[in-house]
Amino acid sequence: MAERSSEFVFTGNPARVIFGAGRMRNVREEVERLGRGRVLLLGSENLREVCDQVQDLLGELFVNRYDGAAMHTPVEVTDIALAQLRTSEADCVVAIGGGSTTGLAKALAARTGVDQVILPTTYAGSEVTPVLGETVEGRKTTRSTLAVLPETVIYDVELSKNLPVPIAVASAVNALAHAVEAMYSPDANPVVDTWALEAAQALARGLRGLVSDPSCRRIRTDLLRGSWLAGMCLGSVGMAVHHKLCHTLGGAFGLPHAPTHTVVLPYAMSFNASEVPDVMDSLASAMNVSNAPAGVWDLIADAGGPTSLASLGLLQTDLDRAADLATEAPYRNPRQITRSGIRDLLQSAWEGNRPPE
């Protein structure tokens, strides 16, 4: 990797992380450590059994539960949960799930200042970031504020070990995207570089392992640890074209969050590769591939993940509007953002062919 400037700024995000198999058992202790005693439990319909277990662990600290977390954090869902929070006089939320449930917890914190304890069941990574994305009338917007950074995150590999392989693949590549874009962020620094490369290595190793032994605890631990490190990257530096496109496609066209990240990442990397060859070389080395964009596409394809926007249901006739939305406002990126360049990127991602080396 080419030498970076010796000048940089690094700000650590203040959060407590508990990592290990079976650590879900600490949830009550962590709520009490925050000095809280009335918990609104957040989950989703597909995690009812796990939510029941956590509810039992909380005992009398539990006061109410909302199982309606939705993708892309629509404000109308937040309003329903907010009413429950206030009616219950809850002073803490415990969120179980992936990015949707974490997003709901953050949205509640943004509105009330309520404390958050997060138990991730996927590899989203948003649980260790001060970033909140919300969807209002079909448009997804993001903001960054420490007011939404969860106080405590409990990483229990038992909660993600049975994550179905297709969901695990998409979620892991979502995490990988955080590490990749952190490497070429204008805010990049040696601390984040170290996290990003370690995350890329662990996630690539985990993606390969999912194919051969999806139930292996070591593989699932690699993925969970990689997602945590990648999330730390996301929470520390600004992101670029990949994240902008994914937010546009999710908010405006309703595409699923993690699969969209999975499809777009190799093409966003290819789009920027000529401007940051040092970054791509370092990532390729960490992931043990010869070419970073093509190597990521191979990892996804070999693991059975989606490789085209067409497969996610996006119509070719949607690409022009997507390009317009993604270039409405300027944002930082290694390669200059133009409407034609983004339209070409989207076309490549829609077709789904392997990026050239």
From Swiss-Prot:
Reactions catalysed, as given in the entry = 3-oxoadipate + NAD(+) = maleylacetate + NADH + H(+); 3-oxoadipate + NADP(+) = maleylacetate + NADPH + H(+)
Pathway assignment reads:
Aromatic compound metabolism; 3-chlorocatechol degradation
The UniProt GO MF terms for this protein read:
alcohol dehydrogenase (NAD+) activity; maleylacetate reductase activity; metal ion binding
Annotated EC: 1.3.1.32
Q: Which SUPFAM superfamilies match?
A: Dehydroquinate synthase-like
Q: Which UniProt keywords apply?
A: Aromatic hydrocarbons catabolism, NAD, Oxidoreductase
Membrane: is it a keyword of this entry?
no
Recorded superkingdom: Bacteria
InterPro entries reported for this sequence: ADH_Fe/GldA, ADH_Fe_C, Alcohol_dehydrogenase_Fe, MAR
Q: Which Gene3D superfamilies match?
A: 3.40.50.1970, Dehydroquinate synthase-like - alpha domain
Q: Name one GO biological process term.
A: catabolic process
Which family, according to the similarity comment? Belongs to the iron-containing alcohol dehydrogenase family.
- Give the matching PANTHER family: ALCOHOL DEHYDROGENASE (PTHR11496), ALCOHOL DEHYDROGENASE 4 (PTHR11496:SF102)
What is known about what this protein does? Plays a major role in the degradation of chloroaromatic compounds by channeling maleylacetate and some of its substituted derivatives into the 3-oxoadipate pathway. This enzyme converts maleylacetate and 2-chloromaleylacetate with similar efficiencies.
Please identify the protein, giving its name as recorded.
Maleylacetate reductase 1
Organism of this sequence: Rhodococcus opacus
